[in-house]
Swiss-Prot record:
Family: Belongs to the bacterial ribosomal protein bS6 family.
Name assigned to this protein: Small ribosomal subunit protein bS6
Domain of life: Bacteria
Pfam family, one: Ribosomal_S6
NCBIfam families: S6
Organism: Prochlorococcus marinus (strain MIT 9312)
Amino acid sequence: MTNQSYYETMYILRPDIAEDEVTNHIDKYNKLLEEFGGTILDSQMRGKRRLAYQIAKHREGIYVQLSHQGDGQHIFKIEKAMRISEDVIRYMTVKQEGPLPTPKPSNKSSTQSENKDNPETKVESKEEQSVTNSDTSTTKKDDNEIKENTES
């Protein structure tokens, strides 16, 4: 078996194709990749987004991200299939150093509720407020002393 490298392919589909056609295209390229000897690690539809510049008279596109592993020969074949397709308006494959880490779900509400339940964070914030108040009072005191010294 040859050396298996990690790759990420991002391709943009035309914005005017139907949702079921989008899933058909995703399935089609996933199957082609596996047929040509690649292993799919992750496939995500990123949704319709505005393009930075107009491509093939389109201002928007449907982004699809595909993480895969293989010997590198499968990339030429999958890119050829994308080049021939009229529904793919842009594609790019990048070689990765290793497998991409799985994204952790970031819930702002869960971290906020943890902070509310944790009494240490409340104490720290009260201490910070008292330090801020004491700093401003010292500054006023120093300002008054300077004014008195300049007046004398």
